[in-house]
Amino acid sequence: MIKNIFQSRKLSGLCVLSILLVSVTILLLTNDTIDLFPYLSLPYLPRSSLSVIPTSTPISSPTNDSSPPLESPVNQTRVDDHPDDQGLELDWLKDDKQWNVSLKIDWKRCESPDYIPCLDNTKAIKKLKSKRNMEHRERHCPERSPKCLVPLPQHYKVPLPWPQSRDMIWYDNVPHPKLVEYKKDQNWVRKSGPFFVFPGGGTQFKDGVIHYINFIQKTLPILDWGKKVRVVLDVGCGVASFGGTLLDKNVITMSFAPKDEHEAQIQFALERGIPATLAVIGTQKLPFPDNAYDVIHCARCRVHWHGYGGRPLLELNRVLRPGGFFVWSATPVYQHDEGHRNVWKTMESLTTSMCWKVVARTRFTKVGFVIYQKPDSDSCYESRKNKDPPLCIEEETKKNSSWYTPLLTCLPKLPVSPIGKWPSGWPERLTETPVSLFREQRSEESFREDSKLWSGVMSNIYLYSLAINWTRIHNVMDMNAGYGGFAAALINKPLWVMNVIPVEGEDTLSTIFDRGLIGIYHDWCESFNTYPRSYDLLHSSFLFTNLSQRCDLMEVVVEIDRILRPGGYLAVQDTVEMLKKLNPILLSLRWSTNLYRGKFLVGLKSSWRP
């Protein structure tokens, strides 16, 4: 009998234990505040019962493996500033059975791992009547943006982190050895084992770029790097060692060069983590506003400033800030044979007619440079005996007129004070009212409100609540930057931001430059002028809803996939309807996605290619 009682109690205990184990298991499986599989989560991912993480391969070293309404303001960059309403806006997700369902798309690979649709349109380039003025290096977009996915280079690796990347990059990520041979005597770049190494040399940097930069300031002390001078344009930048070195002096440089026979110099720059874009001074304006840059630099940049009726130099004059400086380091400055003397005389005549004055001219270790200064008022223009080039009429210089627009043959009138005055020193200019807004009280108020909102939302949401590992982020793009509030809120992070102003929206790019930030005009219905795998993070705030009224959302997503590196992020704030359209497309690309508070969608690009 005692034995039967013992067996009965034993069975009861086993039943209780079984029920307890089942209960714990159900609790674990239904409560996803407990992370059972942390290796499947995105880095620093806050879990909630309504967040969505599709099963996908975690990012490591990417490989080449294969496997099967009412219109709101076009350039609106509003942000969410109500942190306590998250439960109120997620009801739609509970009933949405399609949210985590991938679209079935038969993705194809593009032919080249370095494909740039608007610069590689060979059919359009072959039809050009002339290439004399670099027309073949300008944008020629296909009628329909391609929907293929750019393959990875063989043996592609996760890029080296900043600041290590400034001095060396993986050879396999940019496998273009021609530049090493072509520039072997100029110390631009050399191959060392599995790396490209950048010693800091250049065509004009005989003693290194640091010595060169310091000598420029010593020659003209008013060029106070990182204080008076904050925003620089480097023309024909090579591998961007000039701009990369200036980052240490709190100077942000927009380095640009065409896609040309030097083979991927801009790709080298971006892989190094240095701000750069593909552009050329040909027959059309650069995609920058008037009066933007504090300093423009050209070191043997191979631009014939006096050619094409002087239009290239007039374009520099347009984008140079009143009172700004042009540093020209080239052989005509210091060589004295007849050919170089003739170029110098022509340049002298042209700059005089533009009222530029020489403020310094010197020779530096067998290399010379001259520094010109642009006037800060129209008085010189008006006192010229020969009014050639003439002053522009207002229609030629209206805002947002730098997109597919012919180069000027005239001098834009200079803005009058206080708009024409030099901004405050850095870093004060970042937070002070931009000089371009002084005439517009309403815009000034909007700017203040925008700055306040972005400061809050960055600290409350973007930095700590979204599925973004900021330690891996260096090259950032804000796809519709507004006043640059997103970039300004990140100013203390070791990264840089390319602020893009959509051409169909409000033109606020001058404000961005006034703040000491860099940016560019673009139409997101077309491909961006950059190499594939250039950026770590793309950010969009209410851009896609407005874009969908003009262009194919699928094509925009394909372009984002092209620009982002494997392991890179897309952070989107938009309407519920747009997020519902966007998420299935991202899932079809084998991206991981996560939704925060029903408003913020974060996508993590995988290394998958079709």
From Swiss-Prot:
GO annotation terms (biological process): methylation
Subcellular location: Endoplasmic reticulum membrane
Similarity remark: Belongs to the methyltransferase superfamily.
Source organism (scientific name): Arabidopsis thaliana
Annotated transmembrane regions: 11-31
A Pfam family hit: Methyltransf_29
Alphabetical UniProt keywords: Endoplasmic reticulum, Glycoprotein, Membrane, Methyltransferase, Signal-anchor, Transferase, Transmembrane, Transmembrane helix
InterPro entries: Put_SAM_MeTrfase (IPR004159), SAM-dependent_MTases_sf (IPR029063)
CDD domains, per database record: AdoMet_MTases
Composition bias, Low complexity: 56-69
Glycosylation sites per record: 64, 75, 100, 400, 469, 546
Topological region Cytoplasmic: 1-10
Enzyme class: transferase
Location of region: Disordered: 56-81
Stretches in topological domain Lumenal: 32-610
Protein name: Probable methyltransferase PMT22
Membrane topology: Single-pass type II membrane protein
EC number: 2.1.1.-
GO cellular component: endoplasmic reticulum membrane
Principal subcellular localization: endoplasmic reticulum
SUPFAM superfamilies from the UniProt entry: S-adenosyl-L-methionine-dependent methyltransferases (SSF53335)
Listed GO MF terms: methyltransferase activity
